[in-house]
Structure formats: structure tokens, C-alpha cells
Amino acid sequence: MKNINPTHTQAWKSLEAHKAELSNTTIQDLFKQEKNRFDDYSLTFNNQILVDFSKNNINQTTLSHLRQLAQECALDSAKEAMFTGEKINRTENRAVLHTALRNRTNTPVLVDGKDVMPEVNAVLAKMKDFCQRIISGEWKGYTGKAITDVVNIGIGGSDLGPYTVTEALRPYKNHLNMHFVSNVDGTHIAETLKKVNPETTLFLVASKTFTTQETMTNAQSARDWLLKAAKDESAVAKHFAALSTNAKDVEKFGIDTNNMFEFWDWVGGRYSLWSAIGLSIALSIGFENFEALLNGAHEMDKHFRSTPIEQNIPTTLALVGLWNTNFLGAQTEAILPYDQYLHRFAAYFQQGNMESNGKYVDRDGNVINNYQTGPIIWGEPGTNGQHAFYQLIHQGTTLIPCDFIAPAQSHNPLADHHNKLLSNFFAQTEALAFGKTKEEVEAEFIKAGKSLDDVKNIVPFKVFTGNKPTNSILVQKITPFTLGALIAMYEHKIFVQGVIFNIFSFDQWGVELGKQLANRILPELTDSEKVASHDSSTNGLINQFKTWR
């Protein structure tokens, strides 16, 4: 990948000038100027996903400059570098090949001259066999009973991706009950264990190194809980599987290494649900549906890799997002799914985006001080959010671009629930774009029989300025295929922005310092002695903790 400071490109300079030209043009104005705006600013994928980006402060000139920016920042060669296994994660000297995990064509993908696809397919075949044994009831626990509950123990990408997907695809779940434990807070594992029976519970321990503090602490507590009931060490092998590469420690824990599913250092945690880390997904929805998830992602990979920039959905979303943050001043983006099954989708891409692009040092090692990298990502399902934080989106002083996501078809078509849900989905983007003027507010009062003199003091508070940018992502139906495509779409959006920001999107050094300090503090918490080895604030907090515990 080439290291190019985006602000040194001609396109960036053109965008800065263009921003001034557009400064007095609103989204309302743009819709008046361009009669076919919806047709010209929307894209479809596989006739199953519609992405409408027309309600943004952009015109064709904006898009032209943004596309030129992508070209000047060598996006095309960066894409090929990723897909062909170049070590684009330079700070860890690793390839970035989550796309190989869902490479359904089996076209060779080389890392250090070796095709990774045979190993990928071997793990998938092993996962398929394991799923069949668990789901069919062939696999038995220590008392001869079939498995009824699966507890995935992981953290970060080993938890959030599988949890998000199993929740999103609950309509496809089988009889197995899925549970996810991530937090090292003992409450998380304790409350989960209250819900399950040791005789019929399978634990998946998801840790590549089998040394992750939170995961191994929870796994050890689960092991202790099982053995308290089973009273026989041999029971561990019947109730635990590992998603790991550390065979020595897996075996030492008591897990049969035949039930260890490996993945590779070219799979980043937040991009790992497509790997063995997705075993909980495959157990929940069945392996055929897991393959459909991979198929959807693979189709989006092909779209991203080969579709021209003008019709390229992930690239377009990335460029529009970059325009909103770096030229219009937005610091956050909201992801607002109008689908209760997608209730963890925003949290998943909060990790995906912020851990990838939350960087302040560029690929040359220079501090970035003249442009903004990754935005803050947040969100909740609609319509809940409407009764919580939409007030600020509509009438606050902060610009918050939003992605609205909704399925055209519901898995639960109860009465008129879905029409009511979707009426809100459509209404919100219309309200955010077009607002309500003072004159419209006054006309409403007059129509209601009110005197303008009586209501003049309330009128300003009912005005909506509009001109708030949104994308609308309408999915025909949330299926394993479309969900796979949707997730891959956001993954590639993150990649494109990282390329243009000139940062390394696939490391996460920012998580290390806190872990190092926690390891230093942990031994200090074992006794009641006062500490004085830190700053006065940290000393004071630790000492008060010791007094109160």
C-alpha cells in the first residue's frame, strides 16, 4: 500500500474549495435542483439491498472530487494488496485476509507463497462435522445427555461478532440455546451459569493464544463449576471445545485437541466471525445457514473488488462519510437499525470502526493533526432511539450523520407492527433532511384554531432546521445471505476510509497500555496495604477500594 497524505492531494484541495461553494446549499435545495436525485444517488446490491445516499449534502461535483481522492490515494492497488495477501498490517507484519475465510470460489489466496484455502476449507469441514454431532444430539455430556445450551466465552471480536449475528439471525435458530460471556466481571459468568445445566452445556473457549485474561478467567470459572457437579476431570473434554491455536494449553485445560478449531494471524479479531470464531453462529443456525452468511459476504467482496467506483457501495458510503466528517465537521455517526434482531449491530461496528480507524499516527509514523480519522460510532434500534436521543439529532447543535437500516419484510408480521415501524423509518430521514420551517409551524397553529399572538413564544421551539445527512439502507429481508453482505459492506467501508486516512486499520495498539497497567496493579490489590506507587488520584482510588471491600 502506498503512503499518501490525503491533504496533499489535488482532490483534497478541490474538496475544500467545493465545501465553500456548497456552504449555502441545503439538502432541500439539492432536491429542488436535481429532479432525479433518488435515482442518481442510490445503488442496489443483488436486488436485495438498496442504499439511498441522496439525503446528504453532496452533488455530482462532490462525488467526482471524492472519487478522485480515492484514486489519488491509490485505493485500487490497496484493495488488491488486501485481497491478494500482501502484509498490509505492517506494524504486526501480517496479511489481512478475512475475505479468504469466505472465498467461496476456492481461488488460491497466497500468504508467503502458500495457498491458505486448503486450511480454511479443512477448518470449515471440521466445523460442519462438529455442528452435525452437537445439533443432532449424537454428542453426549458426562451423564449421557445431549447438549441443550452453548456458552461462548470470549471477548472483543471473539464475542461481539458471534453475538451480533446469532441475535440478528434468531429466526433461523434451532433448539440450542446460545449464551455469550465476555466481561471479566464475575457477574457475567455467574448469571449465565444460573441458566444452564452442567449435564447439557457445551462451552466454547474463544482465545487464539488461550491466554486472554478475561476469557481464561471466565473459562476457568466455568470449568470449576462443571467439575463441582461432575467430580471427574474427564468431563471437561465432553463439555468444552476451543477456538484457538495453542494446542499445548488447550490440552492442559482438559480439552481434546480434536475439538480445537484453529484460525490464523491474518484474521483480525473484529473480522473473525467468518472463521472458527463463528462456531457459535453455525451451532445456533446450522452449518448451511452459516455457509449462506459466508456466501453473502463473498458476493459483497466481489462487488467491492470489481465494481467501478461510481456504482461501488462500500466505497461510496466511505467517501460520503469522509465528506461528512472531514469537510462538514461531524465527529460521530449513528447506526440506527429498524429491526430488533439487529440490536447489537451498532455496537459491533462501534468496535469494527473505532478499533480500526481510531488512530492518530499515519502510515509514515507522523502525528495526524490536519484531518480527522475514524468517527465515533454509536446507535440503538428504532423506534426506541426516537424516544431517547433523536431529539439531539434533530435539534441539537452537533451534526450527526445517520445510517438508517430496515428490512422490507419482517420475520414477525404481527398485525400492522411492521408498517408502523417502517413508517417511522421513512419519516425520520424525511424529517432530518427537510425539517419544518417557522411558516409551517405557524400554519399548523392557525389550522388548529390558535392565534399567532398566543403561540409566538412557542413557535421557535417547534422549528426543525433540517439539512441533516442520512443514508437509508433498505434490505429485502434479513437472511443469512443479506446479513453477510451487510456486514461485509461496512467492513469494506472501514477499509476504504483507512486507506484514505493513511493509517493502519488492522492493528489496535491503543488497547495495550491499559492492559499493561492493570497487570501491574493487580498484585497490589491482594492485600490491605496502602499504595503510593501511582499518581495521587489512582493511589486514592485504590486505597478507598481497599477500605470499602
Curated annotation (Swiss-Prot):
Q: Which GO terms describe its molecular function?
A: carbohydrate derivative binding; glucose-6-phosphate isomerase activity; monosaccharide binding
Q: What is its pathway?
A: Carbohydrate biosynthesis; gluconeogenesis; Carbohydrate degradation; glycolysis; D-glyceraldehyde 3-phosphate and glycerone phosphate from D-glucose: step 2/4
Q: What is its EC number?
A: 5.3.1.9
Q: Name one GO biological process term.
A: glucose 6-phosphate metabolic process
- Major site of localization recorded for this protein: cytoplasm
Q: Which reaction does it catalyse?
A: alpha-D-glucose 6-phosphate = beta-D-fructose 6-phosphate
Matching entries from Pfam families are given as: PGI (PF00342)
Q: Does the keyword Cytoplasm apply?
A: yes
Q: Which InterPro entries match?
A: G6P_Isomerase, G6P_Isomerase_C, Phosphoglucose_isomerase_CS, SIS_dom_sf, SIS_PGI_1, SIS_PGI_2
The active site lies at: E355 (proton donor), H387, K515
Q: Which Gene3D superfamilies match?
A: 1.10.1390.10, Glucose-6-phosphate isomerase like protein, domain 1
Q: Spell out the family assignment given in the record's similarity comment.
A: Belongs to the GPI family.
Write down the PANTHER family for this protein, in alphabetical order.
GLUCOSE-6-PHOSPHATE ISOMERASE (PTHR11469:SF1)
Q: What is the official name of this protein in its record?
A: Glucose-6-phosphate isomerase
Organism per entry: Haemophilus influenzae (strain PittGG)
